[in-house]
Each structure stands twice: as structure tokens, then as C-alpha cells.
């Protein structure tokens, strides 16, 4: 039973808590997000207590009906919070007692807020996994659909932000889609470690009253139970993994956003964002700003900060539960909200993006085929290092003459290497260039189509 002060732990205290400390200690402002899973866990625990002979069937039914009523009030937005409701567990138990009386005091038998809160968090994150996994799949599907539809479009590939080699536009899209498939796989792995039940661990030593944890595991549809009660209440590996997953996913999304921001400038003019994902300037009427992409790029650092912050919290804690762990939930809630918004906006950007095919084609230049010139000599039997040097010399000759590489005459090329012959003209065909990269993973059409099929298969797993 709660003490006169209304605190679940107040029986040991004679004095009241300083109001500033009371506010400082409270987590109800954010852990109220857990109201539904907190009630879900309590329902399962009440059934576990009845199975262990700690509740009569009538008491269990009374508690379950009361918890249903509490859930209705939350769902209808009429649940009232009071100053003494320091967290979601206190609030729900207080309201349950108001509804059903003293029987509510039996619900917490053998249970600590230590195992209760981490159970709640795992339940909540399990739901979040399903949502984020769906949004991530939708984004990848949008990217693959676009890659398939625009497979014939060629444009410059860049290294060091310098034009490097001709590639398919689809190849660029898929480079980011493939990175996101790894994020999807990682999220599935994190889910496995989220889906482990700590309930029944008590505060530290376990449960002494015969509560069947395997029964609770089945009731809440967890995949396994935790192995050690001390570890169960204090470990937040699953939170750290989730935050790291989000950090890595945001890294990939930020890099894609950076590319698109550059490609959308007048200097590149390869793509144009839809009005739906752009904003303007309050001073300069001509501006169309890629705020959607800039915010994706910026929000990555917020996620990184939450991940680093949690690790800093965890690394200095002594064994078992410490109040520092209260900070984990704000990180999880914020990052979940951020990822939900970012994935949806990124999907909208990709789905509505307009590409300027002519500008992409015009940006291709013969100097980007210098590697192809080296490959030409390799096919004639020259070792690659010699071929690389010969191609480099041809580039120098063209620069000295002030002409494009493809404007060198056959005679001029033959001064570099006698292996050049009239068929060298095939080298200057951009379509021919991309089609030579037929090895799996390359930018030839057959390889790009193979990549598309592989990504689609991954999405079905």
C-alpha cells in the first residue's frame, strides 16, 4: 500500500520530499508513453500471481477488469494525473486502487518497478520495431521501384567529389538501398534481443513466491526469459543496440541526403525536389530550399547524441538498477519519433524526385573514360600497371593539345602505345562503357537488374 505521502516507497520515510526534488525525480512527463504496455504487463503478472496461488480467481478478475477500465480512460484521454504520480507505474496503480480498492495492493506482490519498467520498455520497443521495420521497407521499395524504372539513365559517378566514371543512375540509387537493407537486417537482430522477458526478476534477487516466469513469457509472447535477475533489471544493451542501429541508419540516410542536396544545386542540376518536400526563402523569392534533406542530415546528429549519451550513462554504473537508467526512455522515445519522421520524409522525397536526364547526360565527359582506355589496352594483352600509365600519358597529351581525350587521333594514341587500333573508337561510347561492368554488383544493366532482384528478395525475408 502507498504511504500517506502517496509514494509507493514512502513507508520508510518520516519527512516529505522537497518539491524541487519531487519534480526532478519524476518521469511521468515522458514515461506516460508506456501506459498501454504497463497495463499489458500488469495483466499478465496478475494471471501469474493467480497461477502461483497468490491471488484468488475472483481477485484476479477484479484486477483485470480494473486494468481494462484504466486502459479505457487512457484511450479516451480522460485519465487524470496527479502530482504524486511520479511515474507511469505509480499512476496506473493509484488509479486501479481508486477503482477496485484494496485488491489493487496485491498486484505488485513480488514485483519491483525495476523489472516492471524494463519489461514495459521492451514491450514498447517491440511495437516500435514493427513500425520502423515497415517504414524502412517502404523506403527501400520506393528506391528499388525507381531504380527499375530509370535503369537506362546514365550520369557521372563521383569519387572525392570529382567526376570518376559513367554509371547508371539506378546504380547510385541501389548503392543507398543496399545500405538500408543492412539496416533492416540489423533491426531484426536487435528485435531478437529486445524480445527477452525480465519480468519476475524482482528488484535484484529474483522472485521468492513461486511465480512461473515461463508462463509470463508465454502470456506476453516473448521469445525467451532473461537468465540472471541482477542482469535483467539493469542491462540496457538492447537500448544501446537500438540507438546504435538508428545512428547507423541515419548515417546512411544523411549521406544519401547530402548527395541529393548537391545534385539539386544549379551547379549540378541533376535532380529537382518536389514542392511538397521543399521550402522557400522569406527574402529571396527565387529560392527553393531542400529543407527536407537538410533536416534529415541534421537530425542524424541528434540520434548520435542520444546513443553516445546512453553509453556514457551505462559505462559508469555499479551493478544492478540505478536511477540513472530512468534516462533511457527519453532517448528511446525521441529516437523512435525521429526515425519515424525521417523514414517517411525520405520515402516522399525519393518517390516524388524529378531527374534531369539531359543534364546528367551532358555532364558525362570523355576524360571519365580514361580507365576504359586502360582496360582497352589490358584486353590487348598489356599488364594493367603499364596500361594505366599509358592511359595517363594519353590524358597528358590531350591536355597539352587542349582537346578532349576522345579527340586524339589514332596516330597520336599510337605514340603512347602501338596497341591502339581503329576499334579504340568503341571506348568513347558511354553506353558501351557501363555495359562492360557485368560482374555481379557492377553498373551493367544485367548486374543492376540482378541487384534489384536481390534487394526485392531481401524485402520478402
From Swiss-Prot:
Signal peptide: none annotated. Keywords: Acetylation, Amino-acid biosynthesis, Arginine biosynthesis, Lyase, Urea cycle. The modification N-acetylalanine is found at residue 2. Gene3D superfamilies: Fumarase/aspartase (C-terminal domain) (1.10.40.30), Fumarase/aspartase (Central domain) (1.20.200.10), Fumarase/aspartase (N-terminal domain) (1.10.275.10). Acetylation modifies enzyme activity in response to alterations of extracellular nutrient availability. Acetylation increased with trichostin A (TSA) or with nicotinamide (NAM). Glucose increases acetylation by about a factor of 3 with decreasing enzyme activity. Acetylation on Lys-288 is decreased on the addition of extra amino acids resulting in activation of enzyme activity. Enzyme activity is regulated by acetylation. Pathway: Amino-acid biosynthesis; L-arginine biosynthesis; L-arginine from L-ornithine and carbamoyl phosphate: step 3/3; Nitrogen metabolism; urea cycle; L-arginine and fumarate from (N(omega)-L-arginino)succinate: step 1/1. 2-(N(omega)-L-arginino)succinate binds at residues 27, 114, 159, 289, 321, 326, 329. The record marks 294 as: Increases basicity of active site His. It holds the Pfam family Lyase_1. The keyword Ion transport does not apply. Belongs to the lyase 1 family. Argininosuccinate lyase subfamily. Catalyzes the reversible cleavage of L-argininosuccinate to fumarate and L-arginine, an intermediate step reaction in the urea cycle mostly providing for hepatic nitrogen detoxification into excretable urea as well as de novo L-arginine synthesis in nonhepatic tissues. Essential regulator of intracellular and extracellular L-arginine pools. Homotetramer. Forms tissue-specific complexes with ASS1, SLC7A1, HSP90AA1 and nitric oxide synthase NOS1, NOS2 or NOS3; the complex maintenance is independent of ASL catalytic function. This is Argininosuccinate lyase. It comes from Rattus norvegicus (Rat).
